[in-house]
Amino acid sequence: MYPVDLHMHTVASTHAYSTLSDYIAQAKRKGIKLFSITDHGPDMADAPHHWHFINMRIWPRIVDGVGILRGIEANIKNTEGEIDCFGQMYDSLDLIIAGFHEPVFAPHDKATNTQAMIATIASGNVHIISHPGNPKYPIDIMAVAEAAAKHQVALEINNSSFIHSRKGSEDNCRAVAAAVRDAGGWIALGSDSHTAYTLGEFDEALKIIEAVDFPEDRILNVSPARMLGFLESRGMTPIAEFAEL
C-alpha cells in the first residue's frame, strides 16, 4: 500500500458518505500519511458552494500524524480548458484535480475531448487529470500524455474505474499508463473513495501500472515527500507543518 491517496469525496458532495474525521480515522488505521479531500467542483448539481473551498483554509494541516491536503475535483467545462475553480478558491487549495463529468461536459468526439483535455492541462491551473481512461470520453492518449509531461501535470489511474464506475476502462488505462511512461510524465493513483472505508485502496490500479512496467519513481503516491515535492515544483509554497511527515 502506498501512503498517499489523492482523490476522495466527503459528505460535502452529497452522493458520498464520509466526513473529514472519518477519513482521518481510516488513515490512521491503514497507515496513510497524507491524503487530499477532492470534493466535486461547484458546477456539479450536488457539489458544495464555492465558499466551501475558500473556507478550507481553516482546516488543520496535520491531525494525529496524518497530513491533509486541501483539494478539489474540478470539472472541465469546455474546449478552452476552463474549469469550475476560480477567484479566491485558488488561494485556499493545495491540489486541483480536473476531469470530465457528464452533467457539466457531455461526451464528444475524440478530437473535441482531446482539445478540451489538452487545453486544461496547458492552462497551468491543474495538477492532475482525473480518470482520463474513461471510455465514454475517447481521447488521443499519446497527445494527452505528451502535453501532461510537458506541463508537469499527472494523469490519474483511478481505482474506482475498475470496480464501481466507468466500466470498460481497463484497456484505456493501460494505454494511458504506457503513454505516460513513454512520455516521461507522472502517474497519480486515486482511490476515488466515496466512503472512508476504501481510502488508500489501489489494488486494481496497481495491476494496470504493473502490466506496463511503469517506473515507481514517476508515481506520486510513493511518499508524502514525493507528492509535496511535485506540488512545490508547480509553485506551492512549502508547508512547514508537513516537514514531520
Swiss-Prot record:
Family matches, as InterPro entries: Phosphatase_YcdX_put (IPR023710), PHP_dom (IPR004013), PHP_phosphatase (IPR050243), Pol/His_phosphatase_N (IPR003141), Pol/histidinol_Pase-like (IPR016195)
Binding site for Zn(2+) 3: 73, 101, 131
Binding residues for Zn(2+) 2: 15, 40, 194
Pfam families: PHP
EC number(s) recorded for this UniProt protein: 3.1.3.-
Annotated binding of Zn(2+) 1, by residue: 7, 9, 73, 192
Keyword entries, A-Z: Hydrolase, Metal-binding, Zinc
The keyword Hydrolase is assigned to this record: yes
Cofactor: record remark: Binds 3 Zn(2+) ions per subunit.
Keyword Zinc applies: yes
Lineage top rank: taxon: Bacteria
A Gene Ontology cellular-component term: cytosol
Cofactor(s) annotated in UniProt: Zn(2+)
Binding partners and assembly: Homotrimer.
HAMAP family given in the database record: YcdX_phosphat (MF_01561)
Recorded family membership: Belongs to the PHP family.
Protein name per Swiss-Prot or TrEMBL: Probable phosphatase YcdX
Species whose genome carries this gene: Escherichia fergusonii (strain ATCC 35469 / DSM 13698 / CCUG 18766 / IAM 14443 / JCM 21226 / LMG 7866 / NBRC 102419 / NCTC 12128 / CDC 0568-73)
Lineage summary: Bacteria, Pseudomonadati, Pseudomonadota, Gammaproteobacteria, Enterobacterales
Gene name as annotated: ycdX
